[in-house]
Amino acid sequence: MKKLTSLFVMLLVSASAFAYTSNKIVIPDVEGYKTLKGDFHIHTVFSDGNVWPETRVREAVWEGLDILSITDHIDTRSRKWIKNGIISDDCDRNTPYKLARKLAARSGLLLINGGELSRRRPSGHTNVLFVKDNNKIVAEAEKFDNDNAKATKAGLTEARNQGAFIMWNHPHWEKYAPNKTVIGPVQKKLLKKGFFDAIEVYNGGCGYSPEAHDWCLKYNLAIMGCSDYHGPLFMNVDYKGGAHRVVTLVFAKEKSIKSVREAMDAKRTAIFADDMIYGREQELKLLFDACIQVKDVKWGEKGISCTLENVSSVPVRITKAPGTEKYRYNRSFIIPPFSTFRFSVQPLLDGNTSTKLDPSVKKIEANIFVENFHVGANKPLKTAIKFEK
């Protein structure tokens, strides 16, 4: 009875937190693709979380996500719950997916079956996504319980046989990578054999890893950011302060499981976390152009004026970049979410004195750095605000 009372209180608190405000993440579609928002690493009561699978669906819908994969620990971590009598030894490791899929379908949320292989050092943790049967993966891994490296390889081999998309989780987790983020010997072998499709560059508990970002570029892996939450969403995210969970942005041809998989295989992903965007240059240029719309452009003898409108949940921080010293415009400014900024470009004589705009000029590009759009470790996106008559 005491446990039921505690659960009831938690549900009431959770409901009241959700009733406080809607914090839907708004990211516009980019040219040629739909921008889908997903979380591909999160836990429930079926491993070491304390949230029911259907609640994970409701949280995702409430926050405006399009994709969710519940990735409970399917092997070693689950034994704690077996020992405590919460689940049985022969528990179906696909249960979280089965419990959540009906509500997800009714809610328009794409639900992907997945799990987390959780081995001790030096193997680490790995997510298997788009799997058909987690039980078979566990069975293969647990044949080598006395050797974590062999267990990981066996589990991932079975996952790959099922057509899984495999993500190396939180390589910068201090417990497994004290003081320095490196590719360990086990991961080197797995990389060489082509087991990894992605790296979790941003983790809700560990934050951002610049090293992992650059590894994704070097080894042609998808750039992923996931919450890895174990408790209720409202206990992890300061919604009152305007925060949101970390999400992976998937640039897909349409909203479908098949299209999401195609986009992830093609590495068309990015991360939105802590008011930052992390990804590849190609996708981030498209995303910037979609987020910042240039409106009310006026050409005159003194130059160009316009309104820059931010139509996204991403605050955009801009600084002037080299290459257009013959024009004067703001060196540094921020366009908050869903707001506008008056922007002007004025010609300079000898890079110093204002002058009239040459009427023969038909095209101007104002070079900028987007300081919170990173295309590599500590490397902001360089692009331009373009004007053409």
Regions found by a protein language model. Name each.
Residues 22-169, 185, 200-213:
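A metal-dependent hydrolase metal-coordination microenvironment
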Residues 115-119, 172-175, 229-230:
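Short glycine-enriched loops at secondary-structure junctions
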Residues 46, 174-177:
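Short, small-residue-enriched loops and turns at beta-alpha junctions
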Residues 5, 44, 71-75, 227, ...:
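Ser/Thr-centric signal marking residues that sit
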Residues 2, 20-39, 57, 124-132, ...:
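Charged catalytic cores and adjacent phosphate/nucleic-acid-binding surfaces used
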Residues 2-10:
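Sec-dependent signal peptide recognition
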Residues 10-18:
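Hydrophobic h-region of N-terminal signal peptides that target proteins for export
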